[in-house]
C-alpha cells in the first residue's frame, strides 16, 4: 500500500465525500447552515486542487501524486489514482464550477435543499475520481455513477414540467451506450487479467480486437460528448435542468467523453483509432455545421447554448483524432475553454430566468439599457463563445485548425465554415438580447446582477482572458503528457 493522507490528490478527493457525511448530520430545516457548509467544503476542495497545480511538475509525463492500494484481492484489483497534465486542469475545472453551482443555487432552490447540496458534493467526488483513477474498472464505475446524482438534479430540481422525461432520456441514452463499454471491459480483463491502465497501454491487442473494443468504447464516449447522432438528449436535458445542473452538464460532463478518448481509446487501441479517423472527422464536421445551423432556429436561450456546445465539441474531436501535438493540446485547451465559457453563458441565462421566469428569446431586447453590468458580461462571454482573439476559445480553435490542416485541407475548410456559422449565431444572440429597443410591455421592473452573481461571473471572465492572453501557462503543463500520448500511439 502506498497511501499518503497529506497527498493533495487524496485531500482533493476525500474532502467532498467527508462533507457529504457531515452534511447528512445537519438538520434539513437549517438551510442557511447547509448552504454555508456546502460552500465552505467546495471552497476547501478547490484550494486543495490548487495545491495540485502548485506542486505539479510540468517537466515530466509521469503520473504524479500517485496512490495505490489493493481493494479487491480475489481478482487482484488495485485502486490506483494519479494525475498528469491532461487530467490536472479537468480536476481544477470541476472544483471551481462546483463553487459556482452552489452559489448560483443560493436562493433559487426552495425544496429539499440539503439533498440538492449532497447531490452536488457527491457529483464532485465522482468527477474527481473519473479524472484521477488509473484503473479501467474504477473509471467505468465512477463514469457511470455520475449519472445518478445528475439524474436526480434534472428530474427533481428541474425548472419545467418535462423534467422527468428529460432526466430519463439523459439516463437511458448514456446508460445504453455504456453497456457496450462494460462488455469490452470484461473482454479486456479476460484477455489480459488486469484492468490497470498503465499495463494495458503496453499490451498489443490484435487489429480485430482493437476494432471491436474501440467501437464499444466509442459508443459510450460519443454519447457523453455528445457527437451527432447521439446528441438528442442534450438540448432537452439543458432546457429542463436547473441553472447549476446546466453548468455542470456543459462545463464538466461533456468533457468526460473527450477525456475518455484521450485516456483510453487512443493509447489502448491506436490501430483502430487511426482506422476510424475518417469516420470521426465526418461525424465531427456534421456536428459543427448541423449544430451551428440548428442553433439559429432555436427560441429557447438554453437550447441555443446546448446546440453550440455540440458544435464546439465537434472541433474537440477533430483535434483529438488529428493525432498530432497541436490537435491534442488544442482539443484539451478547447475543452477547458468551453467548460468556462458555456458555464458562464448558462449562468447568465440563469440570471435572466430567476428574474423574469422565461428563456424565450423574443421577450428580451435592449437589456444593456437597464442591466448594463449584465450586458457587459453577456457580451464578453458571447464573444468568447465565438472564438474572438484574446479569449480562451480562439487559441484552442486555431490549434485544432492547424492540426487538421496538416492532415486534410478540405476538412479544415469545412471546419472553418463552422467558425463562421458560430460567429453568426453568437452575434445574432447578443444583438437580439443586449441591443435594440427595450420591450417594456413584458416585464414590470428590471434589476441588474447582484453582488453574489457578480462574484460568480468575474472569476470565469478572468480565467477566459488569462487563457486567451497567456495560453502557455496551461499548454506548458499539458505538453509532456500530450507528447507521451502520441508516443504510445506511434509504438504500433
From Swiss-Prot:
GO terms, molecular function: NADH dehydrogenase (ubiquinone) activity; ubiquinone binding
Membrane-crossing segments per the record: 9-29, 36-56, 63-83, 86-106, 115-135, 136-156, 170-190, 211-231, 242-262, 269-289, 304-324, 332-352, 370-390, 410-430, 454-474
Keywords on record: Electron transport, Membrane, Mitochondrion, NAD, Respiratory chain, Translocase, Transmembrane, Transmembrane helix, Transport, Ubiquinone
Pfam families reported in the protein's UniProt record: Proton_antipo_M
Key word Membrane present: yes
Biological processes per GO annotation: ATP synthesis coupled electron transport; electron transport coupled proton transport
An annotated GO cellular component: mitochondrial membrane
Presence of the UniProt keyword Cytoplasm in the record: no
InterPro entries linked to this entry: NADH_Q_OxRdtase_chainM/4 (IPR010227), NADH_UbQ_OxRdtase (IPR003918), ND/Mrp_TM (IPR001750)
Membrane topology value: Multi-pass membrane protein
Main location: mitochondrion
Enzyme Commission (EC) number: 7.1.1.2
Localization per record: Mitochondrion membrane
Reactions mediated catalytically: a ubiquinone + NADH + 5 H(+)(in) = a ubiquinol + NAD(+) + 4 H(+)(out)
Family named by the database record: Belongs to the complex I subunit 4 family.
Function of the protein: Core subunit of the mitochondrial membrane respiratory chain NADH dehydrogenase (Complex I) that is believed to belong to the minimal assembly required for catalysis. Complex I functions in the transfer of electrons from NADH to the respiratory chain. The immediate electron acceptor for the enzyme is believed to be ubiquinone.
Protein name (Swiss-Prot/TrEMBL): NADH-ubiquinone oxidoreductase chain 4
